[in-house]
């Protein structure tokens, strides 16, 4: 075995291991070795390579890697195909910025073809950084053969899906109000909108709509979007709701009866009450009357009107509201558009022409006030949708779009979702399920440039549509020869003209590109160019056993995968979804570069190592919980877990090499109870870890392993050190080596999916083979000893209580104490005699015994809890307090047992006192200190005799010399002669404990003499000791 370089940095170790993996093709071997095995399928959600990875990506990649590595070691074949999401507006915006242009008009002036070429060049801007990040974090995924959404084979598969959907009659062209980004100048789908809501304060207005042919009668309508008022064509009431005409300051206002108090506040008189249906067809004068409105400006009935807020009357602007549009269509009212594609007013609103509508609310309100049409204005806080790509506020805007009739197969969506296991479970019928329940048809088209072209050709003469499902299909119907290398992007596909099979007319492609979420949702099929190629491979890799991405993908990729698959095949594309929580800063705030609180995962890997980062992300909390995260979290993972394990591994290698121990040779071994215990813990942990991983409970699995590693380091190795230090090779020492070797090899397999680098380093050095080509550990039931584990757990509890006791009373462990008394509060069959020596040695006490009668060593004190007792006992409180103080110890003990006592007041009143009213304090017998955990109480005799004090000094000296040896980098097995120069009192103490010193310090000879200032000095409290070590001959 190679010596472990404890000074090697984590990054140095990981770089060395990565090089080994690459040279020996370990990743490739791990897949090849499972050829013919059952497949376990996971899909890689495609990131965009025109942005840098963040710490959320580190969590996602870690989780996916843990799953893939574990399932591979569990015997499955796990293909891991990387992917790149390369289309869409973020790419376009980046290119616009690079070119110094802005907006669709300037793009078209620049030229669509050169613009498309620039987009294609830019999509892999950060591919190198993504590859380096992916490799550095240890995520094994095939980045040499990824699926790429811009490539022709991928797009052709997407076309086949869309063509099939069109064939089923589910793709249609419609005019409707859709969420619209005026900055990007394109509409969005409902699941895109769901990703960008923000809480904002907008100016709201209660507007006066004058009833026609009346002197002073007004409908009051409330709106949070005053900018839509110029497009008003109607007012809506609920036909069955009651409305009042109320007089206030000489005016008559019409509002919902339920809202009159909230709207008019005070000083009003209700004149009459009317059903909403009575108000229908009442005409009014619009605040911005438009001559284009030939049928409108009257009250209509609508079921969506409520009295939850506002006035109970809704102002209807059909161009800018989904409900408004539907009701106007059904009523046959006029349609009014006063805003252009940039979100600016047209000449229809002369005084605001060219102004962005969301910046115009104040202008509109001022105009209303000036015209005497403003009843009230106020700031209103509400959730408003913003563009998930550019952060601009969205408008609801009427226009022509291509839509997929998802609502027609809503039941399929819901049934498919019912078969999926969600982590966390509440997502299934909560956030995701509710989104499916409220789904609308998918707005699939985008009026942009860089994306998969919508494969629909329309006839100029008869409106017939043709949706080719392949390049061959398009070529077959083309009116002229199509280039062999036709690129499936604008403007190239736009040049392909098709002949109408119905009338022979010319057909041109509709100019839109598709929603990028449809691209990524098609990946189960398109990654293998299905159905054109790889049919068997696709069938083997569909559906996914699991997918894992951030919670923000709930209405993104998780939805688009489900939707595309349901529309195309009717089948569910995944069996399980791991919805990962956000990684927040240590204050619980979302990380962002603008706030300066974002952590760079590459920096974290370079500083602490990938194993530490991965472990920190896994062990802190379940991955679907939002987690507070910081450099400190990663540092703790490194020091508490990775470094602890490396230290144990280093200890084993060091002593095994010194003793020339060879695990492949046969030795006479005699396993101790400690060996049996650690092997039982190893296999019970293996059992728990496998169970947890099979249920995707990564944090539970990691914590089980962390507990085991801590026990191996701080209990097994520490309690076994004397065996490793002994000369020669006896049966118990051989057992210690054999046991620790088995423990380390098995732990390296257990942690391989979690911390792949340190696992590989340990396994490779101890066995000569890669851990990632091994099977995951299985439980050896014959080694499980639950009773032994329970007993050792009790011992550990007592030792921990003893240490805590010493800490609380400033008694160093090196200072021997006379006695430890253990009080057991619950009867059990624990054989403490078998563990007497361990407890005495660990806690450095000279005697140990178990006592069932705790009254011999403790008593109780009762103090009144005035905070709760004061209000309860009133005038009796002081008398109760005095009574408590004079209770006998038997009476106090009875109160502690029964948890109640009765005080008879001077008035004869009986006052019941319970544990809620009293603070119970356990007091140790004089000369003892106590610490308890409810199950056990540890009593330590704190009287330190002169003899004990002297031994404590000797043990402190041993500790100081051991530290000094480490500073000199002396071999651990080197015996030395020691010369000391110190005061006479310390000389005498050390002489009296010469045997103890020689046993613990590998010292052959101790002598005292005069040393010069050039020799080194040790500090024992305030005492200085000069020391000189020399190797024995």
Curated annotation (Swiss-Prot):
Keyword vocabulary terms for this entry: Aminoacyl-tRNA synthetase, ATP-binding, Cytoplasm, Ligase, Metal-binding, Nucleotide-binding, Protein biosynthesis, Zinc
Binding site for ATP: 593
InterPro entries recorded: aa-tRNA-synth_I_CS (IPR001412), aa-tRNA-synth_Ia (IPR002300), Anticodon_Ile_ABEc (IPR033709), Ile-tRNA-ligase (IPR002301), Ile-tRNA-ligase_type2 (IPR023586), M/V/L/I-tRNA-synth_anticd-bd (IPR013155), Rossmann-like_a/b/a_fold (IPR014729), tRNAsynth_Ia_anticodon-bd (IPR009080)
Intrachain S-S bonds: none
Molecular function per GO: aminoacyl-tRNA deacylase activity; ATP binding; isoleucine-tRNA ligase activity; tRNA binding; zinc ion binding
Family: Belongs to the class-I aminoacyl-tRNA synthetase family. IleS type 2 subfamily.
Protein name, per record: Isoleucine--tRNA ligase 2
Organism: Bacillus cereus (strain ATCC 10987 / NRS 248)
Gene encoding the protein: ileS2
């Amino acid at each position: 075995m190679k010596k472990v370089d404890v000074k090697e940095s984590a990054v140095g170790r990981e770089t060395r291991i990565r090089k080994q993996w690459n040279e020996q093709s370990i990743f490739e071997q791990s897949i090849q070795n499972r050829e013919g095995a059952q497949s376990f399928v996971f899909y890689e959600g495609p990131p965009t390579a025109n942005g840098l990875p963040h710490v959320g990506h580190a969590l996602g990649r870690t989780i996916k890697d843990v799953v893939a590595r574990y399932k591979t070691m569990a015997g499955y074949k796990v293909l891991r195909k990387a992917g790149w999401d390369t289309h869409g507006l973020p790419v376009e915006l980046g290119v616009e910025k690079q070119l110094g242009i802005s907006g669709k008009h300037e793009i078209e002036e620049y030229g669509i073809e050169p613009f498309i070429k620039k987009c294609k060049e830019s999509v892999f801007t950060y591919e190198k950084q993504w590859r380096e990040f992916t490799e550095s974090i240890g995520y094994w995924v095939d980045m040499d053969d990824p699926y790429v959404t811009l490539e022709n084979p991928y797009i052709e598969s997407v076309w086949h899906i869309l063509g099939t959907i069109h064939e089923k009659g589910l793709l249609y062209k419609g005019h409707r109000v859709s969420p619209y980004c005026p900055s990007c100048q394109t509409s969005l789908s409902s699941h895109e909108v769901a990703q960008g809501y923000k809480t904002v304060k907008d100016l709201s207005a209660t507007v006066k709509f004058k009833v026609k042919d009346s002197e002073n009668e007004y409908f009051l309508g409330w709106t949070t979007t005053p900018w839509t008022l110029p497009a008003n064509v109607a007012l809506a009431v609920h036909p069955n709701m009651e409305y009042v005409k109320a007089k206030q300051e000489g005016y008559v206002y019409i509002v919902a009866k339920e809202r009159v108090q909230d709207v008019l506040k005070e000083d009003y008189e209700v004149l009459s009450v009317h059903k909403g249906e009575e108000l229908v067809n009442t005409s009014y004068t619009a605040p911005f009357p438009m001559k284009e409105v030939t049928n409108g400006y009257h009250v209509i009935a609508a079921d969506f009107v409520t009295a939850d807020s506002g006035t109970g009357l809704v102002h209807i602007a059909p161009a800018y509201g989904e409900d408004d549009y539907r009701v106007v269509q059904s009523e046959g009212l006029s349609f009014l558009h006063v805003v252009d594609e940039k979100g600016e007013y047209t000449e229809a609103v002369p005084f605001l022409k060219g102004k962005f509508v969301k910046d115009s609310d104040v202008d509109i309100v001022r105009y209303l006030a000036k015209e005497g049409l403003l009843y009230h204005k106020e700031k209103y806080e509400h959730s408003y949708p913003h563009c998930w790509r550019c952060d601009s506020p969205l408008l609801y805007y009427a226009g022509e779009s291509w839509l997929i009739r998802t609502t027609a197969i809503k039941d399929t969506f819901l049934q498919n979702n019912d078969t999926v296991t969600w982590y966390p479970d509440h997502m299934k019928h909560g956030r995701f399920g509710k989104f499916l329940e409220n789904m609308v048809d998918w707005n699939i088209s985008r009026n942009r440039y860089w994306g998969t072209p919508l494969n629909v050709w329309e006839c100029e003469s008869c409106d017939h549509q043709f949706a080719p499902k392949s390049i061959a299909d398009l070529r077959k119907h083309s009116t002229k020869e199509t280039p062999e290398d036709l690129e499936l992007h604008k403007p190239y596909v736009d040049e392909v003209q098709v002949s109408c099979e119905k009338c022979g007319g010319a057909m041109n492609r509709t100019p839109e590109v598709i929603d990028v979420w449809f691209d990524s949702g098609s990946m189960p099929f398109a990654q293998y160019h299905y159905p054109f190629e790889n049919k068997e491979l696709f069938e083997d890799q569909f559906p996914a056993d699991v997918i894992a991405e951030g919670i923000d993908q709930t209405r993104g990729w998780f939805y688009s995968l489900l939707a595309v698959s349901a529309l195309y095949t009717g089948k569910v594309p995944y069996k399980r979804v791991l919805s990962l929580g956000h990684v927040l800063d240590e204050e619980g705030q979302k990380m962002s570069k603008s706030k300066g609180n974002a952590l760079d995962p590459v920096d974290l890997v370079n500083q602490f190592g990938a194993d530490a980062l991965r472990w920190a992300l896994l062990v802190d909390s379940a991955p679907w919980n939002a987690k507070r995260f910081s450099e400190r979290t990663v540092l703790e993972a490194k020091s508490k877990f990775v470094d602890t394990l490396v230290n144990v591994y280093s200890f084993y290698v060091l002593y095994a090499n010194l003793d020339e121990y060879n695990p492949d040779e046969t030795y006479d071994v005699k396993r101790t109870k400690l060996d049996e215990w650690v092997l039982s813990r190893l296999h019970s942990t293996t059992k728990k870890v496998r169970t947890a991983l099979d249920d995707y409970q990564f944090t539970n699995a990691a914590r089980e392993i962390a507990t085991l590693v801590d026990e191996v380091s701080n209990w097994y190795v520490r309690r076994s050190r004397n065996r490793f230090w002994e000369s020669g090779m006896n049966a118990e020492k051989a057992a210690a080596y054999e046991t620790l070797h088995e423990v380390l090899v098995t732990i390296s397999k257990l942690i391989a999916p979690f911390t792949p680098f340190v696992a590989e380093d340990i396994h490779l050095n101890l066995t000569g083979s890669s851990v990632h080509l091994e099977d995951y550990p299985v439980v050896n039931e014959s080694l499980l000893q639950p009773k032994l584990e329970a007993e050792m757990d009790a011992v550990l509890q007592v030792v921990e209580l003893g240490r805590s006791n010493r800490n609380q009373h400033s008694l160093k462990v090196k200072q021997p104490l006379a006695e430890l008394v253990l009080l057991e509060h619950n009867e059990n069959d624990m054989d403490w005699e078998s563990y007497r020596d361990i407890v005495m040695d660990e806690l450095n006490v000279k005697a140990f015994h178990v006592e069932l009668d705790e009254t011999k060593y403790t008593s109780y004190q009762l103090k009144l809890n005035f905070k709760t007792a004061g209000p309860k006992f009133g005038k009796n409180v002081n008398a109760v307090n005095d009574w408590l103080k004079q209770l006998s110890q038997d009476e106090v003990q009875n109160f502690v047992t029964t948890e109640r006592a009765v005080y008879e007041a001077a008035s004869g009143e009986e006052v019941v006192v319970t544990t809620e009213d009293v603070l119970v304090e356990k007091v140790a017998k004089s000369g003892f200190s106590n610490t308890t955990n409810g199950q056990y109480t540890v009593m330590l005799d704190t009287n330190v005799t002169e003899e004990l004090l002297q031994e404590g000094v000797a043990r402190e000296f041993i500790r100081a010399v051991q530290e000094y040896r480490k500073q000199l980098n002396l071999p651990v097995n080197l015996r030395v002669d020691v010369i000391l120069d110190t005061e006479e009192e310390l000389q005498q103490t050390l002489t009296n404990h010469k045997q103890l010193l020689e046993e613990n310090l590998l010292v052959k000879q101790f002598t005292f003499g005069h040393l010069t200032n050039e020799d080194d000095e040790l500090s024992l409290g305030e005492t200085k000791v000069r020391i000189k070590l020399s190797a024995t001959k």
